């Protein structure tokens, strides 16, 4: 996994409800854990743009509900700072469900994805229609 160019402020913590931006049948996801996070004692685990997280499906089709899956954060409301000084933030917090090879399980993505995510996950970038 590559390092990100931008200074990503982590805007999601464990327990956050986020939207699912693909067509797998899930509509709302709950963050249950963040892979690779090592924090301080008593600190809430946080995730940001381009992080791989474990989620539980809270709303969606009956086949998808209550499943525990892996996902990648593609949008967050909290602004991130790019090397040229610009700040980017999105209207919602969203993630894409991925498989064990970090390929998206859905065939299409709804809405834009951040350029930082496209650099780190090429398979998600090839599925996306808008890269900001």
From Swiss-Prot:
Domain of life: Archaea
Record key words, sorted: Ribonucleoprotein, Ribosomal protein, RNA-binding, rRNA-binding
CDD domains attached to this UniProt entry: Ribosomal_uL14 (cd00337)
InterPro entries, alphabetized: Ribosomal_uL14, Ribosomal_uL14_arc, Ribosomal_uL14_CS, Ribosomal_uL14_sf
GO terms under cellular component: cytosolic large ribosomal subunit
GO biological process, one term: translation
A GO MF term: large ribosomal subunit rRNA binding
SMART domains tied to this protein: Ribosomal_L14
NCBIfam families the UniProt entry points to: PRK08571.1 (NF006344), uL14_arch (TIGR03673)
Subunit and partners: Part of the 50S ribosomal subunit. Forms a cluster with proteins L3 and L24e, part of which may contact the 16S rRNA in 2 intersubunit bridges.
Protein family membership: Belongs to the universal ribosomal protein uL14 family.
Function per UniProt: Binds to 23S rRNA. Forms part of two intersubunit bridges in the 70S ribosome.
Protein name: Large ribosomal subunit protein uL14
């Amino acid at each position: 996994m590559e390092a990100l160019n931008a200074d990503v402020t982590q805007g999601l913590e464990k327990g956050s409800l986020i939207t699912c931006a693909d067509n797998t049948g899930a509509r709302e996801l709950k963050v249950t854990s963040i892979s690779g996070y090592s924090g301080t004692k008593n600190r809430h685990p946080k995730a940001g743009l381009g992080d791989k997280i474990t989620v539980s499906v809270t709303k969606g089709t009956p086949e998808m509900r209550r499943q525990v899956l892996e996902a990648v954060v593609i949008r967050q409301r909290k602004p991130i700072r790019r090397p040229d000084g610009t700040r980017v933030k999105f209207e919602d917090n969203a993630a894409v469900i991925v498989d064990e090879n970090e390929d998206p399980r859905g065939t299409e993505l709804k809405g834009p994805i951040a350029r930082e995510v496209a650099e780190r996950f090429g398979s998600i970038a090839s599925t996306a229609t808008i890269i900001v």
